[in-house]
Structure formats: C-alpha cells, structure tokens
Amino acid sequence: MCTALSFNQFFGRNLDYEFSYGEQVAVTPRNYDFHFRHLDQHESHYAIVGMAHVFEEYPLYYDAMNEKGLGMAGLNFVGNAKFYEVKEGKNNVAAFEFIPWILSQCASVKEAKVVLENTNVCATPFNEHFPVAELHYMISDEHESIVVECMEDGMHVYDN
C-alpha cells in the first residue's frame, strides 16, 4: 500500500515495498524533449524533480513536483484502475506519461482540472517489459488537492 499526503506547501508519499524497483531521484530540466506516444512533442514546459525508475533515458515517475510547486503521485489502485483506448478529439496520454504530462504544463491544481477535462489516460504500455501499472493519482498544490481515478465507468476527479 502507498500513502500520499499534502499540507500547505509540503507534499510526500511512501512506497511500501520490501524490494527496490531501481528508483532514483530524477530531474527533468525545463524544456526537456518529452516525446509522448499519442501527442505532439512538448517543446516548452516546467522543470520536474521526483522519484522515478529511469529506463532508456525516460523517467518513469512514481511521484514528482514541478518548479511551480505542483506535486503528483501515482498510488496503487489494483483491481480498480482501468485505462482506455485512444479516443479521437482527446489528449491521449499513456498512463506512464500522465505525471510528466500534468506537471510539465500545470502550475496549480486549478490548471490541472482544466487540462483533465480533455485528457484520456490510455492503456499504452511503456514497452513489453513494463505493463500498464494500476494506479490512481493525487495532485496537490499549497491550496488544494484532488484525486484522479480512471475506472471502468470513466475518469473521476475528486476534491481531496
């Protein structure tokens, strides 16, 4: 089980595993060349720092915070999470890209809520060795926090 919390400007989480996934501190500099699977390249974005497994020079973030103070964590949601097929007319983001997708362009939870309105989190695996993780997400800034859950009946966004 994973737990995340935020209070004022503090954001944190734990990763309750008795073994390592090779996690490390990862820093994605401002304007890093993100290549999203189903979207155009992100040429201008915020810097991000967090914990990730870095594979093939790509940070698979567990949790992170951007330079504006917006934090996001992916937490276990096994048996409940359901990600979707690519949908025309939506911003289709693979689940493994969801954290950098939000943190690269949003400075606040308020901005994240607007971006989420047209976001479709896709069941696209990183590669054959990394299946889609069953997660839900907490997004927080110093003023508010939300939980994002992708389930069989759609994406739900809850004030937290």
Language-model regions, residue ranges each:
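Extended amphipathic alpha-helical segments with heptad-repeat/coiled-coil character used for oligomerization
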Residues: 131-160
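An acidic- and aromatic-residue-enriched active-site/binding cleft used to recognize and process polar
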Residues: 14-16, 76-77, 117, 142, ...
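Surface-exposed patches in mature extracellular/periplasmic domains of secreted proteins
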Residues: 125-129
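Alpha/propeptide regions of enzymes that mature by internal proteolysis
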Residues: 88-122
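Residue-level preference for alpha-helix termini and adjacent loops
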Residues: 14, 64, 102-105, 120, ...
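Residue-level signal for alpha-helical context at structural boundaries
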Residues: 29, 130-131
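Short, solvent-exposed loop/turn segments at the edges of secondary structure
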Residues: 65-67, 94, 132
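A contiguous strand-loop segment
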Residues: 1-90, 123
